[in-house]
Curated annotation (Swiss-Prot):
Pathway: Phospholipid metabolism; phosphatidylinositol metabolism. The keyword Acyltransferase does not apply. One of its GO terms (biological process) is inositol phosphate metabolic process. It comes from the Eukaryota. It comes from Oryctolagus cuniculus. The lineage of its organism: Eukaryota, Metazoa, Chordata, Craniata, Vertebrata. This is Inositol hexakisphosphate kinase 2. The keyword Transferase applies. GO terms for molecular function: ATP binding; flavonoid binding; inositol hexakisphosphate 5-kinase activity. It is found in: Nucleus. It catalyses: 1D-myo-inositol hexakisphosphate + ATP = 5-diphospho-1D-myo-inositol 1,2,3,4,6-pentakisphosphate + ADP. Belongs to the inositol phosphokinase (IPK) family. Converts inositol hexakisphosphate (InsP6) to diphosphoinositol pentakisphosphate (InsP7/PP-InsP5).
Amino acid sequence: MSPAFRAMDVEPRTKGILLEPFVHQVGGHSCVLRFNETTLCKPLIPREHQFYETLPAEMRKFTPQYKGVVSVCFEEDEDRNLCLIAYPLKGDHGTVDLVDNSDCEPKSKVLRWTTKKHHVLESEKTPKEWVRQHRKEEKMKSHKLEEEFEWLKKSEVLYYSVEKKGNVSSQLKHYNPWSMKCHQQQLQRMKENAKHRNQYKFILLENLTSRYEVPCVLDLKMGTRQHGDDASEEKAANQIRKCQQSTSAVIGVRVCGMQVYQAGSGQLMFMNKYHGRKLSVQGFKEALFQFFHNGRYLRRELLGPVLKKLAELKAVLERQESYRFYSSSLLVIYDGKEWPEVALDSDAEDLEDLSEESADESAGAYAYKPIGASSVDVRMIDFAHTTCRLYGEDSVVHEGQDAGYIFGLQSLIDIVTEISEDSGE
């Protein structure tokens, strides 16, 4: 049994929150769930939990905010569907943000422990009873989509055309095969372990995509080595082989997953880790170019902010003594929303912030106005195999900085710089 599923004595309270699949998960094998608009939930792995609780202050801006621990239970409805429900956990030192104070989407419905009864499960209304009603409504909507995804999940790269006139964000949640796959696998693992226990500890983390209307997400596996010091010989050999057969060995980074909305063509593009492993260095560069391309032209205004954040992160990691971030990923996130176009003959003050798009790229009479489009995020995630001399129980203590991870960051900086220079910036 994996560390995330070891028996733990946890005591659920009287109220719980129904956890939903996190639709913007593009990589990793651990299931990530949506707790509320700004908070995600994933199985607690002791080493990752330890990392977040002892995180160096200067690294905090490059990792999701840690919000605490919850107890998660599951119920099976009459159709044998499993639903995961989170309960508050007494005694955790993290701060659980139970009320969404974000003003990014003030009109959105928020899940709380004590309000919104259509989302909160109270003791007098059994979870099973509530779940049956909820599932019955959702089943009719999702049945056809599930049938369509049987073949989509087998594809390493897929495109899906969306209705550009509709709400792209709402359509996006239906078409992420990797998210569906991880959610189904998580439920199956919990079902198989049901005889042993029905309660698990999950950690709560900041939802990095919550401030973006149409999140474009790139998941990069960083470093030249992926296996932890505690890996078995078989596991280590398997991870070494994956690195040797991918760009990890050559440039210290490989694509682990990608989700891009190309507003110009009205397509969603998904790429999974299996395709990422097959990419050559040139293929990796092309994938990065594709990530920053909206189907009509390159989003050049994103490249400068990305380079700045990568350089800042590199400087921070160069100061971290004895840390090794084995199998950790780096997320790059920006908004793929198509912003309104502004006519070139508009008033001067309207043109003040226009991007420098040429006439042929912007269909002649218009230039593209990326309002807030340069807002891009770069964060480290997944620390289940991180090690440091602060973790006294580790049998291996490393010296100096994580050269493999830093090498991958420098490669990334070089490639994004190359894309920027080739595009004429």
